Structures are given as structure tokens and as C-alpha cells.
């Protein structure tokens, strides 16, 4: 797991939990090993903590979920990979002169099955976030992903993608290098691959930047993750000319896992540990590994033509429209 000495920024709705956790930790430091009174007090505080977490996490608003998945302690692709894969190696470069650190990938084994993995990669702390461009890939990142996916298709290896980005990099240089074209080519090619593709939204799934590695046979989503055409802040600024309307925008956009399951956008919602994946990254990775294994077992029974047909029809069914 990636570690950081940086003090986490706690969202307002999580402050009561953070304060109670702090009290428990202080008591643990002060308590003698066999002090029954203090140990009983610690146990009582821990029970209160669990009750408080259940109360808060059972009623999170869409905007609160967004703030939750933006926490720096949220597990990233490279946090999950060691817990999911038995062995793995990262591969680099798009063979066109770029190696975007905001999008990582490689080959590995999950329960003895060879796979190719690809995922957005955020940083922790200012220095690492700048190096990773805050998880916003440039065109070279999507071309690197495409190279790896073509490798998987050639050698018959399933593809696992992990989505966690506020969006593709929208800088002038990205446009000069063909950001739109790079994402569009990925969409086209992912529909043509003859191997199983399982996409998992592990954090923030933002716009075309998420969709650039988001075409799959199964779309999984962690319980508190979000998936949206635009951030609530951007949507509010566009529609209401006021980013303070982001709460209303988040409600209207239907960004939560439960909303998207009802709408048929995602196939499965994966349970997270109490407190979110950041509270227990290892357990979260094991939940994810179990579901990925089941999905691969199921999809591997289908022939390539059936996979492609189902994948195409799956995305054609999304959304609603009227014919005039």
C-alpha cells in the first residue's frame, strides 16, 4: 500500500467520527495494558464509533459521497493491485514517446489466470499529485492503455480496468496532442476486443476521462464511488452560473452507485468496509478480488462473438430517447 505522513483533510460530515477516533487513540496510548477501567472505556468508545459510522454512512448525500472518494487516503489502483493480483508487473510507454503517470497498467495473475490491468492513478500530497497530474490522463495515457489492451487481445488475456479520475486532462497541450481522438479510438477499439473486459469504478468516475477505459462486459462500482458526466461543481457553474449549487447538481446528476444500478449503467455494486474503502483497504481489495474472480469465471465461458455482441448491446440500451 502507498503510505503518506500527511495529515488527512477530513470532510465536515466526518468530523464527529474523526474526533471520536482521536479520543480512542489517545486512550490507547495512555492506558496501561491491564487497566480494566480504561479498557472498558475504550471498548465503550469503539462501540459508539461503530454506531456513529453506521448512522452517517447510511444517509450520505451524493455530494458527501463525492467528498468521501476525493479523500487522499482513498485506495488507488496501485493500492488495490497487490491485494488483488498474485503477481504483477507494471508496463510503461505508449510507443509514441509518452509514459503518462496518471494512467498505469501492466500484466499479472489473479488466481492463476493471466490478465492485463489498467487504471487511473492519483497521488497523495501535493508533490505526488503534481507528478500524477491529479489522476487526469493526457492523450499518451489513453494510447498507453490502448497498447496494453491490444496486447491482451492478441494473447487472449482478460482486461481489468480501474476507474478513478475527475476527468481527462483538459489543458491546451492535451488538445494539441489529440485528447478527443485518443479517447474516441479507445471507445471504438474496446467494443472490438474478443476478450472479457471488467471495469470497476473505485473512486471518482469523471466524464470522458473515465469512459476512455470504461467500455466493458461488466461494469462494477464500489458502494461509495461516483460516476458522472461532469463534476457537480462544473454542472452547477454551467446551469446555475454558481458553483455553490453543487448540492442540487449532485442530486440531479444521479451519480451514486444505487442510482446508476437502477438506471442500468452499472451491473454490480460492491460493498465497502464500514467507513469506506479507506478505512480498511485490504478488506476492500479482497471484496473486489472475489467479485472480479466471479465475473471472469462467468465471462470466460462465452465465445468472442457473443462477448462483442453483448457488450455492444449493453451500451446501446443505456439512456432514453424519443423518435420524432
UniProtKB/Swiss-Prot annotation:
Compartments in which it is found: Plastid, Chloroplast
UniProt KW Ribosomal protein keyword: no
Plastid found in the keyword field: yes
Catalyzed reaction equations: N(6)-carboxybiotinyl-L-lysyl-[protein] + acetyl-CoA = N(6)-biotinyl-L-lysyl-[protein] + malonyl-CoA
The protein's assembly and partners: Acetyl-CoA carboxylase is a heterohexamer composed of biotin carboxyl carrier protein (accB), biotin carboxylase (accC) and two subunits each of ACCase subunit alpha (accA) and ACCase subunit beta (accD).
HAMAP family per the UniProt record, alphabetical: AcetylCoA_CT_alpha (MF_00823)
Name listed for the protein in its UniProt record: Acetyl-coenzyme A carboxylase carboxyl transferase subunit alpha
Gene that specifies this protein: accA
Amino acid at each position: 500500500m502507498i503510505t503518506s505522513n500527511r495529515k488527512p483533510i477530513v470532510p465536515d460530515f466526518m468530523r464527529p467520527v474523526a474526533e471520536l477516533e482521536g479520543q480512542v487513540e489517545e486512550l490507547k496510548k495512555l492506558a496501561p495494558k491491564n487497566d480494566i477501567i480504561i479498557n472498558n472505556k475504550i471498548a465503550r468508545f469503539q462501540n459508539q464509533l461503530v454506531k456513529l459510522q453506521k448512522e452517517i454512512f447510511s444517509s450520505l448525500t451524493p455530494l458527501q459521497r463525492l467528498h468521501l472518494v476525493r479523500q487522499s487516503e482513498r485506495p488507488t489502483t496501485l493500492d488495490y493491485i497487490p491485494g488483488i493480483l498474485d503477481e504483477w508487473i507494471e508496463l510503461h510507454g505508449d510507443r509514441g514517446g509518452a509514459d503518462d503517470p496518471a494512467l498505469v497498467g501492466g500484466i499479472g495473475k489473479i488466481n492463476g489466470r493471466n490478465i492485463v490491468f489498467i487504471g487511473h492513478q492519483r497521488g497523495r500530497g501535493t508533490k505526488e499529485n503534481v507528478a500524477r497530474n491529479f489522476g487526469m490522463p493526457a492523450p499518451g495515457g489513453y494510447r498507453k492503455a490502448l497498447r496494453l489492451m491490444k496486447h491482451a487481445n492478441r494473447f487472449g488475456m482478460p482486461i481489468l480496468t480501474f476507474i478513478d479520475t475527475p476527468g481527462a486532462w483538459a489543458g491546451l497541450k492535451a488538445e494539441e496532442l489529440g485528447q478527443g481522438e485518443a479517447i474516441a479510438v479507445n471507445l471504438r477499439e474496446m467494443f472490438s476486443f474478443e476478450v472479457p473486459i471488467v471495469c470497476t469504478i473505485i473512486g471518482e468516475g469523471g466524464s470522458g476521462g473515465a469512459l476512455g477505459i470504461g467500455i466493458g462486459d461488466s461494469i462494477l462500482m464500489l458502494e461509495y464511488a461516483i460516476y458522472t458526466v461532469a463534476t457537480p461543481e462544473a454542472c452547477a457553474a454551467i446551469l446555475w452560473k454558481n458553483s455553490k449549487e453543487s448540492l442540487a447538481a449532485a442530486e440531479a446528476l444521479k451519480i451514486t452507485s444505487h442510482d446508476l444500478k437502477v438506471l442500468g449503467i452499472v451491473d454490480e455494486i460492491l460493498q465497502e468496509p464500514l467507513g469506506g474503502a479507506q478505512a480498511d483497504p485490504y478488506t476492500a481489495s479482497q471484496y473486489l478480488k472475489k467479485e472480479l474472480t466471479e465475473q471472469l469465471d462467468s465471462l470466460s465461458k462465452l465465445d468472442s462473438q457473443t462477448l462483442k455482441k453483448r457488450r455492444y448491446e449493453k451500451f446501446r440500451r443505456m439512456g432514453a430517447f424519443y423518435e420524432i
